[in-house]
Amino acid sequence: MRWLFERKSESTKRVIYRYSRDSNDLDGLVVYDKRMEEAFIYEPCVEDRYSYPNRKESLAHFINYVVERSFPERKKVVFVYR
């Protein structure tokens, strides 16, 4: 499993990231509201579009690897299940 997050824009109110799962398409959008301190998937990527558990997993990785690391410009998360 692989996720790719890339910052699209940042303001004093929110940070917007493009993201994808298992591809480099960056076809989804995740928004983090700085005032409310919460993240949500604004537009799911193709792999998450019809699967609520996939969206929850992608959002968890966004929070753990992007938000907790002070919003890097680009972040790739890779998990190898054996």
Question: Which residues fall in each region the model found?
Answer:
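Extended interaction-bearing regions that mediate binding to partners or small molecules
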Residues: 1-2, 24, 35, 45
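Acidic, low-complexity intrinsically disordered segments
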Residues: 31, 36-82
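Amphipathic, interaction-prone secondary-structure segments
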Residues: 2, 7-28
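N-terminal start-of-chain detector that recognizes signal peptides
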Residues: 1-5, 49-52
